[in-house]
């Protein structure tokens, strides 16, 4: 770390849970963010601000005016630009000291495997079931920690899934690859709800990368109407084709 790093990250360096050692770990880390929408936008901003050394940003979409209600990484000037291009430019202005890799593609197959293999942590910020299942399978196969979240309407959910997957994976809870009936396009979404989930993804990534303890292998459900949380603990089951299986029970 140099003098510029000490100045830039001074507020989080004051935390005993991070300090110099934790910050050095962040600077040496690589995070793959798949999806730059309502989840990936705040996650990318906070991880760039925190000094995660390399951010790989994957999305195959362009910025649309309807995105701006919740995707705070973008402005009206970015409309019709690739999200990865606009995101890299914005994040570079926020923190020019980190490496930003733009991947304008829907990651899958070999490309997904290669990017997951390079990452210390993967953030699933996508909005379709097939991609979520593919990301989960790649993370399990390559033993890469996965932080997955989603939000629709006034509800959100978050999971931190880590090897050796003794308490389950994403496929264990959602074995059906079909798309859910409710999504942001059909049921709507309030920006702060999805933003909260994306911010928590960034927080959990910072905790994992810096060596802090965190709540793993638990499905956390948020209800914005009551501002309440429910936690579902994962338990092993035998039928999962990805990791060997798990189920969830309320705690």
Specify the residue positions occupied by each region the protein language model found:
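Adenine nucleotide-associated cytosolic modules
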Residues: 1-251
């Amino acid at each position: 770390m140099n003098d510029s790093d000490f100045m830039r990250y001074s507020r989080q360096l004051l935390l005993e849970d991070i300090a110099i050692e934790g910050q050095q770990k962040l600077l040496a880390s690589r995070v793959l963010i798949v999806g730059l929408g309502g989840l990936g936008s705040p996650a990318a901003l906070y991880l760039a601000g925190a000094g995660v050394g390399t951010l790989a940003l994957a999305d195959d979409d362009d910025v649309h005016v309807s995105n701006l209600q919740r995707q705070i990484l973008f402005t009206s000037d970015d409309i019709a630009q690739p999200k990865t291009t606009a995101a890299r430019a914005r994040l570079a202005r926020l923190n020019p000291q980190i490496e930003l890799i733009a991947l304008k593609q829907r990651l899958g197959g070999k490309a997904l495997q290669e990017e997951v293999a390079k990452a210390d942590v993967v953030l699933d910020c996508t909005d379709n079931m097939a991609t979520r299942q593919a990301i989960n399978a790649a993370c399990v196969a390559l033993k890469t920690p996965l932080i997955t979240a989603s939000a629709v309407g006034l509800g959100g959910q978050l999971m931190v899934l880590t090897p050796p997957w003794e308490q389950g994976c994403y496929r264990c809870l959602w074995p059906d690859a079909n798309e859910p009936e409710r999504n942001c396009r059909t049921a709507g979404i309030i920006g702060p709800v999805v933003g909260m989930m994306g911010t928590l993804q960034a927080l959990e990534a910072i905790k994992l990368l810096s060596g802090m303890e965190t709540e793993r292998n638990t499905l956390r459900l948020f209800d914005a109407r009551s501002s309440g949380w429910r936690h579902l603990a994962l338990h092993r089951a035998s039928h999962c084709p990805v990791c060997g299986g798990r189920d969830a029970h309320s705690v």
